[in-house]
Amino acid sequence: MTNSNRIKLTWISFLSYALTGALVIVTGMVMGNIADYFNLPVSSMSNTFTFLNAGILISIFLNAWLMEIVPLKTQLRFGFLLMVLAVAGLMFSHSLALFSTAMFILGVVSGITMSIGTFLITQMYEGRQRGSRLLFTDSFFSMAGMIFPMIAAFLLAHSIEWYWVYACIGLVYVAIFILTFGCEFPALGKHAPKTDAPVEKEKWGIGVLFLSVAALCYILGQLGFISWVPEYAKGLGMSLNDAGTLVSNFWMSYMVGMWAFSFILRFFDLQRILTVLAGLAAILMYVFNTGTPAHMAWSILALGFFSSAIYTTIITLGSQQTKVPSPKLVNFVLTCGTIGTMLTFVVTGPIVEHSGPQAALLTANGLYAVVFVMCFLLGFVSRHRQHNTLTSH
C-alpha cells in the first residue's frame, strides 16, 4: 500500500467518526426548532430521533457481513447518494413520516461509514500503533461534537432553517466521497485475492465476551451519567448555565485526553493500562457523585481526561484477539457499544422517575465498576500479547 493511499484511507476514517459525532450530538441543539416546525411537543419529537440511533445500530451490525459482499468503495459511494436523498427529504418535506425515514437513512449511512472507518484503521495499523490511531480517529467524534453545535447555534440565531444544519453535516460526507477517487481499499471476502493456504476458522475466545460487555456497560454508563449531570447539578442549587458548563468541560477534557493518550498508549500494554483507566474512572465518578458542588468542576475534568481512552482501547483489544483483524469481531464490539447508546434513556428514565437524578449517576458508576471487572478478567484470557508478538517478527 502506497503512503498517499494510506493517508487517504486514514482521513476517510477520521471523517467517518466526525460524521457520526455531528449527527448524534447536534440533536439536542435542533430538537426544539424541529418540534416547532412540525407543531409538536419536544417530548414526542425526541422519540423520532430513535430512528437515527436505530439506523446506526442496524447498519453497524449488518455491515459485518456486507463488507465481505459489497466492496468498501461501493458502499461509501452509495452512501453519498443516500446522504443527498436524506438531506433533500429533510429540506422539502413537511411530513413527520418522511422526516423519520430521512433520520433512519442518515443513521444507516453514518453507521456503515463509521464501521468502515474503524475497520480501515484496524487493517492498516498493528499493535500499539493501532490503539493510538484509533484513539486519534475517535477524537474526531468529539471534535465534530464541539464544532457542529456551534455551527447550529450560529445558523439558528440568524433565523436560518434547522435543516441547513444537516446540509452542513452533509459536507463531511462530500469530503469522504471525494477521497474515494483514486484510492484503493482493502478487498474482503469473495473480492479478496485468492491464496492456496487453507482458510483458518477464526476463534474469538472468551476475551471478546468480556470486551463486548465492557463496551456496552461503558457507553451506557457514560451517556447515562452525562445525560443527567445537568439535572443533578440544578438539584444542588447550581444555575442552568453552570450545569451546562460541567458537560462542556467533560467533553473538552475528553478530547484533550484522547490526543494525549494517542501518544501515551504506545508505551504501555493495552490491557493493563485499560484496567488502570477503568478503575480510575469508576473512582473519579464516585468522587463526583458524592462530592460538593465546589469540587464538581475538577472531578468532572479529571473524569473526562482519564476515561477518554477506555472505549477505543476496548475496540483495539477486540481487534487483537484474532491473528488477522476480523470485521465481524470489530463490528460485534461496536454493536454492543451502540446498544448501550440505545438503552441510555430506557434504563435511566425509570430510575430518575422513581429515585431522582443521583440514582441514575450511581447506576452509571456501577456500570463503570463492571467495566473495571471485565478489563481485569480480560488480563487472564486476552490473546493480544501473543498476536502482537507474531506481528512484530
Swiss-Prot record:
The chain crosses the membrane at residues 11-31, 51-71, 78-98, 101-121, 140-160, 162-182, 206-226, 245-265, 273-293, 297-317, 332-352, 361-381. It is a multi-pass membrane protein. It is found in: Cell inner membrane. InterPro entries: MFS, MFS_dom, MFS_trans_sf, MFS_TsgA, MFS_TsgA-like. Keywords: Cell inner membrane, Cell membrane, Membrane, Transmembrane, Transmembrane helix. Belongs to the major facilitator superfamily. TsgA family. This is Protein TsgA. It comes from Shigella boydii serotype 18 (strain CDC 3083-94 / BS512). The lineage of its organism: Bacteria, Pseudomonadati, Pseudomonadota, Gammaproteobacteria, Enterobacterales. The gene is tsgA.
